Every structure is written in C-alpha cells, then in structure tokens.
Amino acid sequence: MNIGIVNDLPLAVEALRRTIALRPEHRVLWVATDGAQAVDFCVAQPPDLVLMDLVMPRIDGVSATRSIMERSPCAILIVTANVGANASYVYEAMGAGALDAVDTPTLGQGGSADPSQPLLAKIDQIGRLLATRMPAAAPAAAAPAPQGALPPLVAIGASAGGPTALTALLRRLPEDFPAAIVIVQHVDQAFAIGMAQWLDGYSRLPVRIARQGGVPQAGEVLLAATNDHLHLTARGSLAYTRRPEETPYRPSVDVFFHSVVDHWKGEAIGVLLTGMGRDGALGLKAMRTKGHYTIAQDEATSAVYGMPKAAAAIGAASAVLPLERIADQLISLVQRNRQRRR
C-alpha cells in the first residue's frame, strides 16, 4: 500500500517509517507535518492509507480527517501518542470517518522497529479491506419482491469504529441481496457523502445518501446524511427531523429504530454495531419486542463496546454475534423470509 504519514514530530515520523519498512508491500508516499498539508497531499497524491496524528499545528487530526473525507475520501488510521488519553478526540475522528486508532510505535534498542507492535496489525487489517475493494461496475438488480409486498428492511446503527465494521459487513453481502438497508452512523453531514462514496467502493450493493422523501428499496444501501434525525414516516418514506432536540447524538439510531417499529409494514431486522454510549439500545429493544429479529455486535470484535453492550444488557438482541458472522446471519434471515412469503 501507498501510505501517507501526518505527524509534526520527527522522532514519531521516523518510528512510523521504520515500522512500515518491516512490510515490503508498503511504502511511504509522502509525509505531512500538519493537517492542512495532509489535506492538500491527499488531493494531489491520493494514498491508500493515511496514518493521522491528532495534535498538530494549523489543523488538527480531527479537522483534517473531516476535510479529507469531504474532498478525497481514503482510509484513515489515527496514530497518536496515547489513544487512551485522547479518547474524546479519537471518538470524534472515528465519527468523522477514521477507521480505527492505535498508539504511535516506539523504537527499540538501537533504533529498530518492533514487528509485534499493534500498528502493523492494524495496517494489515486495513490492507485486507482495501484488497477486497469492489470494481466500479453497476451491481446486478436485486430479485424483485412479490407484487405488493415490501422488501425486508435491515436497519443498522453504528458509531465509533463503525466505518470499519460497516465495510466488513457490506462486502460480505451478495449483489442480489433482496433486502433494503438503511444505516445510521454517527457522522456530521459535511462528510456523509464522502463516507457513502467510501462504503460504495467496498459493497456489491450501491451505497447512496438517504434523501428526504425516498423509500428504502431492495438491493440498495442508504446512509443517513444530515445532522437531523432520519426516520420513517407513516407512508413508509424517509424524512429528516430536528426532534427530539435533546438527544446527545445526531442522527440518532434510537429515533430511526423506533420509527421502524411504528411505520415499517414489512419484515425488519435491527443491527447495532460498535459505538460509544447507549444510542440504539432502546430502539433495538423496541424492535425485538415488536417481533423483529435483532443483532448486537459482540465485545471481541467491537472497536468500542458501548452501544451493543447496552443493548445486550437489556435483552434487546435476539443474537450477539462477532462481526464476521453478521452478514451470513442476515442472508439466512432474509432467505427464510422470502421462502415464507412464497
């Protein structure tokens, strides 16, 4: 992979260079010493992966991540001196589109890089995701639902760590997946379009922005795209609303899940992925109470085990699954649903 380094500390840059050099398949494309320079470099020479520090002069790592996802979306890994001490900034950057976060590597005795440091494992993981990027071709049309019937709806909520989890989930779904998918990811509207474009590159299904008045369609993935709440109306169409005003997250997973319970007339499946806090737990519980199947991501595969943990704690999940098993479960559930309707 071609990797861009964004860090203003020479010692940290050298540690990153030497760690990357342990993998002959990777090379340093450029080094930026602040966020503004990183944005310009990403536009002029798009890398496969950016290693982004958080605290830098001019533009910090969070703002740079936002700008990159707006102007030239690419994979971004937060690499900072102490992830734990900068947790709030890390979560903000992951909400802006960064895939994951890891501590800056240190050099061993004699200035050598340690191959066991977590950075290499993170780079390898992202490299595997990039290797599965789908060609830009029109996906096959999903098999039509029976006349007059709504397609199954898969409602997905995610927050910190969501971009990586969503990429891994979507790439496992076939191009003829006969369900509609709506995603509520905690992102600012400024870079939602970039995230949709990013996800589209790893999905056999088209990923688009959810538009006011649109209707979820089989074989299509829609992403909430404003700082208002996405919800279903009584007519089954999508709309955005400022209410409720007091929610800590915008868009809110809970608001969308509750609207599925109230207004979706067909089958539905709720999925709550990695994320900080509790958003989505009550909505997932409401979906399960209504009779819909619900899934929460497990702790071992969650970047931040907050939202799915809250859901599991209140019995909101029909199943708690590792990320790699969720797509297969969705395929199985949708197939069973179609067989019942024949």
Swiss-Prot record:
One term of GO molecular function: protein-glutamine glutaminase activity
Localization (cell): Cytoplasm
Main location: cytoplasm
Active site: 159, 186, 279
Boundaries of every Response regulatory domain copy: 2-119
Superkingdom in the source lineage: Bacteria
Enzyme type, top EC level: hydrolase
PROSITE patterns in the cross-refs: CHEB, RESPONSE_REGULATORY
Modification(s) after translation: Phosphorylated by CheA. Phosphorylation of the N-terminal regulatory domain activates the methylesterase activity.
Disulphides: none
Keywords: Chemotaxis, Cytoplasm, Hydrolase, Phosphoprotein
One Pfam short name: CheB_methylest
Gene3D superfamilies associated with the record: 3.40.50.2300, Methylesterase CheB, C-terminal domain
Membrane-spanning segments: none
Keyword Nucleus: no
Protein name: Protein-glutamate methylesterase/protein-glutamine glutaminase 4
Organism (species): Burkholderia thailandensis (strain ATCC 700388 / DSM 13276 / CCUG 48851 / CIP 106301 / E264)
